[in-house]
């Protein structure tokens, strides 16, 4: 008897970690396929796209064209995700080489679509729950858990509510079940994500949903580390910050994109909170022992004049965030900002970003130098992409892939013959030995 050879699958996940979770759900539905790193050899190619800002759209389109041009004869090309949701008609007309187009509603039906070689377009945005098996990408120790989809905020620059809809939270019980399932599979480090994490369960009538989650996770008494990403200023409270500070499971990690600090800009951007509120929240975060505060800013939004920029400049210089992402304003059709006047030109925007980056890089260097000589709790994640001779680690406090890397090039962990043991993913005590060219180097002292 001759058995049919398993078909091969190549998946490219673009954009944010929320998109990554959806990609992992698709892989969970397609476990009968053999994963291949070689696009040219794949029987099925899936590109889970991002369509948030212009650069993300261009990356998605270029990736689609590359896949179409380089796939083997007969290979199926599937395009999913935000770009596919926003521009279904345009993609069908302009890139007819795409075999299946599906947006953000049917990740759990990907196996049926491929089997039937046809698209499915449902109305309701998909939100993974504990019943959706995932194949976690890139780690056997860390996993993302998505709390909700959609957003009830009305930021002037953001198109997400147009294609992701209103806030749609999963239940507390669903979230806890997924956490427990992942823990039982061996995962120990978790990042909870959403478009607006601090509004979790508000659509279910719970104003303190995220605080309920923190208490419930603590009550599980699991030996884990966790952090919450994407807090929103107008839905974050001092009580929430205190809940995170007192938690035995959640780290004092505060990721709150504030986008600007000048009152005039916060109003123009429709952020729902003023400068005083932002400062109150940020100062409360800074008061938490061993805190880590991360944010993002948009530069060049309409009405950002020199006065507003200088106010932001001085604020960044004085507050010294642990991490900052800077984005040049990207016009999005259908948003309030798209029709606003007084947009700084590209040259001015780039100059402002360059000016701020100099401050930020100086602050990062100071943060890194302060770590040299310290012993820290870290998470080792495997071999580094910098070199096969280094292990890759991060402070336990840091988020995966976004906050930095420690290159481990020495270890005191040895066997009975005093031979250095191979290190596996997990918690370690690490001594930071050097900071060079923005890289931290460390020595593994013990497995925790």
Swiss-Prot record:
Primary residence: cytoplasm
Keyword Transferase: yes
Family annotation (InterPro entries): Elp3/MiaA/NifB-like_rSAM (IPR006638), Methylthiotransferase (IPR005839), Methylthiotransferase_CS (IPR020612), Methylthiotransferase_N (IPR013848), Methylthiotransferase_N_sf (IPR038135), Ribosomal_uS12_MeSTrfase_RimO (IPR005840), rSAM (IPR007197), rSAM_horseshoe (IPR023404)
Domain Radical SAM core: 137-366
Cofactor: [4Fe-4S] cluster
GO cellular component: cytosol
Record GO biological process: tRNA modification
Sorted UniProt keywords: 4Fe-4S, Cytoplasm, Iron, Iron-sulfur, Metal-binding, S-adenosyl-L-methionine, Transferase
Note on how the cofactor is bound: Binds 2 [4Fe-4S] clusters. One cluster is coordinated with 3 cysteines and an exchangeable S-adenosyl-L-methionine.
Job description of the protein: Catalyzes the methylthiolation of an aspartic acid residue of ribosomal protein uS12.
Designated name of the protein: Ribosomal protein uS12 methylthiotransferase RimO
Source organism: Helicobacter hepaticus (strain ATCC 51449 / 3B1)
Gene: rimO
